[in-house]
């Protein structure tokens, strides 16, 4: 799922289709047919050197029900792209990047954020000195969408059981806050420019 959605062809397709979609009440399947989403998916899935996509196709081919599983997977990706087209049309936010690795380090007096792909390092002074041990976070920002100076940080969730508002309020879930801080530093943004949100359950798309 992530590899297909992160492909540059998919991102460009979503943005271009979102700009053309004017009827907000269209059903997802109507969007799939109108923009011939299946053609795009076939290009991205079957003409791709991405390791995750290639390995997934090989594993599916080994199963006796491989055709059913493959068609079900393609259909769910179709509906996911249709949802993204509608989202892009309604909100005007555009997907900018997916799966960006970063390293965030907090020590007594500063926060350091490193973009692992480019090696870019940004430092932010805390303004006060704290007696704390070094804290390091390493992870992936699933996705960032942009609209002017504003950005939306999206964290994909894969099941119903790994997220609740109560867990967030009690501090048991901190990923989205960490991702937002990393984006604030990497993009030189103000805190008020960033909206951190949790995304839909990707495991249930199409059900």
Could you describe each region identified by the protein language model?
Residues 1-4, 197:
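Short alpha-helical scaffolding segments that buttress acidic/His motifs in well-ordered protein cores
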Residues 110-207:
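Mg2+/Mn2+-dependent nuclease catalytic core
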Residues 1-2, 77, 143, 179:
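Short conserved aromatic/hydrophobic patches within beta-strands of well-structured domains
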Residues 3-118, 125:
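A non-catalytic, helix-rich entry segment at domain boundaries
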